[in-house]
């Protein structure tokens, strides 16, 4: 794991690999001697390959699935059904796969997005924003269908009342688009597949994933049910909530015992990790022989949209950095707490340093 100072140095070197130790020291308000010690340590860790400075290319992540525009409306008071409610609206790039990719980029990871958007102003806006955040978008295809939209209605406290997803453009994402990304998939450290994928696209991605830790994010109950038969030993992890777990396994998940039984059926299919969102209780991380309960972190909720996406992105970030699944899950909870406290679906100031500080602060007795 890198220290906060090492990550700050790497961030500067990514922008300017020829930056010298004196300039680094000035930018960070420290001494050249201190910078040289950190540079030496980064070399020992294999992150910097030489002076100049040459940064080692980490395996990075590939995320395949939905990219759309989020349209959010929030009520000014407790919402009343079957009538209009005063409130305010906003629009920003979204989509589960795209959100995960942007979060990973903001955490400093190399990430490719594989998706489809329309040849329309919404698609242009989405791609411009996503690329500016650091996501590689050369494998995002264009279609004549309109760019997908996710319309969410939030109550006064930021909790979701209802959402409607129009993912017609993502339905254009088939095996051919996945095949075009085969080289970046083969070299990835983590591959994330979201439940917006068609069955044939999901199957093809799994066929290309040999040797790559592959994670399936179900997205919703209907989408989990549609793809449940594709889950097998090609997957490293599955990340459902309780309702999605029931849809994936055709088993009840009302009690804790039932949740464990349902998770065991995924293990029996060859899935190594089942990471279950348990609502206010936090999450369960299950292997074939261990259950780790991870409590949710307290947060002042501004908007719950995107919390699960940041949680999974932070999980992947720690895996790419060599951490354990438990470390990754705890890091994910801290990222989710930061995200729900923000009005943004992807928190723009999200960094590993901020997440670590939040984790340390909220885990204090």
Report each predicted region and the residues it spans.
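Alpha-helix/helix-capping structural signal
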Residues: 67, 243-244, 289
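Conserved phosphate-binding/catalytic region of the ribokinase-like
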Residues: 1-21, 27-28, 33, 37-54, ...
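Glycine- and other small-residue-rich loops at beta-strand/loop junctions that grip anionic moieties
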Residues: 28, 89, 115, 140, ...
């Amino acid at each position: 794991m890198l220290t906060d100072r090492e990550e700050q140095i790497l961030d500067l070197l990514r922008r300017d690999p020829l930056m010298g130790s004196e300039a680094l020291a000035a930018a960070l308000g420290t001494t050249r001697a201190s910078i040289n010690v950190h540079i030496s340590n980064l070399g020992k860790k294999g992150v910097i390959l030489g002076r100049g400075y040459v940064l080692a290319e980490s395996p990075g992540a590939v995320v395949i699935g939905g990219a759309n525009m989020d349209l959010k409306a929030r009520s000014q008071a407790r919402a009343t059904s079957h009538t209009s409610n005063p409130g305010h609206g906003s629009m920003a790039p979204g989509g589960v796969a795209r959100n995960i990719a942007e979060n990973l980029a903001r955490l400093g990871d190399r990430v490719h997005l594989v998706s489809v958007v329309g040849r329309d102003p919404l698609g242009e806006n989405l791609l411009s924003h996503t690329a500016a955040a650091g996501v590689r978008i050369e494998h995002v295809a264009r279609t004549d269908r309109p760019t997908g939209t996710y319309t969410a209605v939030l109550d006064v406290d930021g909790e979701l009342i209802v959402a409607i997803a129009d993912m017609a453009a993502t339905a254009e994402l088939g095996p051919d688009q996945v095949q075009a990304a085969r080289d970046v998939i083969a070299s990835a450290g983590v591959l994330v597949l979201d439940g917006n994928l068609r069955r044939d696209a999901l199957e093809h991605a799994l066929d290309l994933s040999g040797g790559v830790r592959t994670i399936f994010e179900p997205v919703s109950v209907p989408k989990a049910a549609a793809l449940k038969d594709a889950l097998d030993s090609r997957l490293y992890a599955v990340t459902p909530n309780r309702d999605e777990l029931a849809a994936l396994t055709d088993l009840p998940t009302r009690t804790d015992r039932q949740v464990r039984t349902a998770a065991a059926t995924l293990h029996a299919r060859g899935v190594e990790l089942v990471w279950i969102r348990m609502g206010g209780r936090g999450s369960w991380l299950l292997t074939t022989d261990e259950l780790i309960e991870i409590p949710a972190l307290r947060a002042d909720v501004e908007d719950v949209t995107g919390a699960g996406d940041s949680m999974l992105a932070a999980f992947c970030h720690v895996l790419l950095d060599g951490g354990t699944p438990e470390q990754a899950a705890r890091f994910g909870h801290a990222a989710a707490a930061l995200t729900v406290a923000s009005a943004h679906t992807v928190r723009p100031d999200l960094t590993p340093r901020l997440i670590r500080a939040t984790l340390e602060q909220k885990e204090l007795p």
